[in-house]
């Protein structure tokens, strides 16, 4: 049994357990009277949908199915019309706020034609949907965060966006700007978008996390956080910032097992791409992943000049050498370790578990991270294709 409760409300209600929705009555709460007007309507709609589902199950021909689907679409439109009329009738009610939050832009089923009359405007529906997505959402009513609606609205919207930092940062600024005068909505929005950026599996999205920390947390806008919690965000951003995609790779200078020194900065200019790998021979996942990386590099090396700069992280020299020998990890590999703990690679490259991999181009720029054997070849193919396209544009 659900009802709407705001601070300071005093009201009473009566109902029968036999049918709580149909028998619910309220005294002293116009809000809930309106809400249960809708709940009772939903009961009748539910009965109609059940009848439609039964008809669909019994449909024998395409014509039967099409007729039932039309009934379902008509009923959906009836619900939209009911909600729109409800909003007009009770515009100040919280239920109206909810209905507005639930609404989605209406876009044509097919893409319209461009002015030339020959080409479809293939992004029109996307642009329209995205551009009108928040039109009816009330960014000034903090109560909405106590429903599941706002989180779902954010999830759907950020899934809709192109997952690149510039796009995410722009939309984060838009939403946080809209909620800046609504403390609870702002707090929830900043928390949600920060978590989205920090936990994203999409390569490069950590740039958005750093952006949020630098532009909101460090500027004192997360006023609800204790100093210790705020410092954790700032510290995490500082560790990520130097190794984001697009940043120059910080040099690593370490010896191999024979004491010969090798530097990352002298390696990447000699290859089209260099894979910087941090791994441990005692790590179970590394024991499986590193041989797979070698298989992958043998394929990639037929396409481009490819090298691997592999840093052993745990000073397990005997196991390290054995794993290299057993898996023939020699061609295109440079193996180094840090027996004197002089390189500070864990902080520089955010290495707190293994394996960790970065892809570095010929100019020393980080072009990939959060990698494994399954996606490195695809990333290089993409980068090579982009280089070719950019070169063709320059010649035109």
Annotate each PLM feature.
Residues 1-9, 159-162, 176-180, 185, ...:
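Start-of-domain marker
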Residues 1-3, 353-356, 362-396:
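Non-catalytic, surface beta->alpha helical segment in thiol-disulfide oxidoreductase systems
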Residues 321-358, 362:
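Short, internal strand/loop/helix patches
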Residues 1-91, 101-102, 106-133, 140:
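A non-transmembrane, solvent-exposed segment enriched in polar/low-complexity residues
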Residues 263-293, 307-309:
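Short active-site neighborhood of thiol/selenol oxidoreductases, capturing the structured segment around
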Residues 287-327, 341-345:
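Structural microenvironment flanking redox-active thiols in thiol-disulfide oxidoreductases
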Residues 199-255, 267-271, 318, 322-325, ...:
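N-proximal helix/coil linker or "cap" segments that precede and/or mark the start of modular domains
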């Amino acid at each position: 049994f659900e009802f709407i409760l705001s601070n300071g409300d005093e009201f009473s209600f009566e109902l029968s357990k036999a049918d709580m929705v149909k028998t619910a009555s309220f005294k002293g709460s116009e809000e809930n009277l309106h809400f249960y007007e809708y709940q009772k309507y939903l009961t009748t709609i539910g009965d109609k949908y059940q009848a439609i589902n039964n008809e669909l199950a019994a449909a024998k021909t395409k014509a039967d199915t099409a007729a039932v689907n039309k009934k379902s679409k008509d009923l959906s439109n009836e619900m939209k019309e009911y909600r729109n009329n409800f909003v007009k009738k009770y515009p100040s009610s919280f239920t109206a706020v909810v209905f507005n939050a639930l609404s989605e832009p209406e876009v044509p089923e097919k893409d319209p034609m461009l002015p030339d009359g020959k080409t479809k405007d293939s992004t029109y529906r996307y642009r329209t949907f995205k551009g009108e997505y928040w039109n009816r959402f009330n960014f000034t009513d903090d109560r909405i965060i106590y429903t599941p609606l706002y989180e779902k609205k954010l999830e759907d919207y950020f899934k809709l966006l192109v997952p690149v930092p510039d796009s995410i940062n722009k939309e984060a600024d838009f939403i946080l700007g809209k909620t800046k005068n609504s403390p609870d909505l702002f707090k929830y929005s900043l928390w949600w978008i920060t978590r989205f950026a920090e936990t994203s599996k999409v390569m490069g999205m950590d740039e958005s996390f750093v952006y949020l920390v630098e532009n909101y947390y460090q500027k004192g806008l997360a006023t609800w956080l204790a100093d210790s919690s705020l410092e954790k965000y700032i510290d995490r951003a500082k560790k990520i910032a130097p190794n984001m995609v697009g940043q120059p790779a910080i040099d690593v200078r370490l010896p191999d097992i024979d004491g010969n020194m090798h530097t990352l900065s002298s390696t990447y200019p000699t290859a089209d791409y260099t894979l910087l790998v941090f791994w441990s021979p005692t790590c179970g996942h590394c024991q499986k992943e590193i041989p797979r990386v070698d298989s992958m590099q043998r394929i990639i090396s037929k396409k481009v000049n490819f090298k691997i700069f592999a840093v052993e992280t745990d000073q397990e020299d005997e196991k390290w050498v054995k794993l290299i020998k057993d898996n023939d990890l020699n061609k295109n590999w440079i193996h180094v370790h840090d027996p004197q703990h002089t390189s500070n690679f864990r902080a520089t490259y955010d290495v707190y578990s293994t394996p960790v991999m970065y892809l570095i181009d010929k100019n020393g720029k980080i072009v990939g991270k959060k990698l494994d054997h399954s996606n490195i070849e695809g990333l290089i193919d993409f980068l090579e294709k982009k280089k070719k396209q950019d070169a063709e544009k320059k010649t035109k």
